[in-house]
């Protein structure tokens, strides 16, 4: 009896073909309407799954298939024509801020990174903008929270942007302590919220701290002990971070203002007036944002461009 019921519910070959064709058509239409571009392997995998197993693949595609968000775009200054630098021209075509001279200081170990991070927080005079995927419930995270709260109590405007997935295990006491001190806290795409659109797997992994729109601390480290000092007798993870100032820091501040305005559904704020620090630059740097809010796969495109431009190896 059960086998007979299953057979009655199973589609015929023609019905399966029709459902598969409609699923593939749905993929083509949504991809065209959104203007999305995928790697050939990813596109082939989606089409094969939709054609062969549409009953499972189509719901997965509708839930997780979207690659990009569509927040309001950033207005960037474009380079003068004829730069003859392929990388600069490529990034300018993507609408990214141009390269600028900066004073760069690298931190190759966690102790140096922690010292640089906390020094920047303590030297802030006007504002601090923080974006991180993880804010740890550990001495490093608690120390960062205390310093941010202290700066806010001293009259510094402090804003903290956390990712909704990375903040799932964050104790509410951290957020309460920050808000009680006057720190503004926002969550990028809260995991269990119905607000907004797009799949929940599109996250904000940016890790940066901008002080007075002039100094930037960034790199691969989240604000958690395992990235700096280690925890539970374990050595810290090997990672790298840096601080720099001037033009690239302003580009990072502009990106944070855009991210914050998107989450809060408001207009981005105006940046502070730039400070002339001529003569302290040590390198030419460029802010290269990537993620679901960028219309292009910026880092991937730059790596491919470098491969095509290679002359010797």
Kindly label every feature range from the protein language model.
Residues 313:
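Phosphate-/nucleic-acid-contacting segments
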Residues 1-305, 309:
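N-terminal localization/anchoring segments of enzymes in phospholipid and broader phosphate metabolism
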């Amino acid at each position: 009896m059960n086998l007979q019921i299953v057979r009655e519910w199973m589609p015929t070959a023609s019905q399966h073909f029709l459902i598969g064709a409609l699923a593939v058509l749905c993929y083509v239409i949504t991809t065209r309407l959104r203007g999305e571009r995928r790697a050939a392997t990813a596109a082939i995998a989606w089409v094969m799954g939709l054609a062969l197993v549409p009953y499972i693949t189509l719901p997965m595609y509708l839930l997780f298939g979207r690659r990009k968000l569509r927040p309001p775009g950033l207005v960037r200054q474009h380079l003068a024509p004829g730069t003859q630098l392929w990388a600069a021209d490529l990034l300018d075509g993507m609408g990214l801020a141009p390269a600028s001279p900066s004073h760069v200081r690298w931190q190759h170990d966690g102790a140096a990174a922690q010292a640089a991070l906390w020094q920047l927080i303590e030297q802030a005079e006007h504002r601090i903008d923080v974006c991180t995927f993880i804010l740890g419930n550990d001495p490093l995270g608690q120390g960062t929270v205390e310093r941010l709260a202290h700066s806010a109590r001293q009259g510094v405007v402090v804003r903290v942007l956390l990712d909704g997935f990375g903040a799932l295990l964050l104790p509410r006491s951290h957020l309460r302590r920050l808000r009680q001190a006057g720190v503004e806290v926002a969550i990028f795409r809260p995991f269990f919220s119905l607000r907004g659109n797009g799949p929940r797997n599109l996250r904000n992994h940016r890790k940066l701290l901008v002080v007075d729109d002039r100094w930037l601390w960034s790199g691969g480290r989240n604000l958690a002990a395992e990235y700096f000092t280690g925890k539970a007798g374990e050595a810290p993870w090997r990672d790298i971070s840096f601080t720099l100032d001037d033009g690239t820091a302003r580009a990072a501040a502009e990106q944070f203002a855009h991210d914050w305005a998107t989450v809060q559904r408001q207009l981005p704020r105006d940046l502070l007036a730039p400070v002339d620090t001529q003569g302290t630059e040590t390198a030419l740097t460029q802010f290269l944002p990537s993620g679901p809010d960028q219309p292009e796969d910026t880092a991937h495109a730059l790596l491919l461009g470098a491969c095509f431009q290679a002359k010797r190896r």
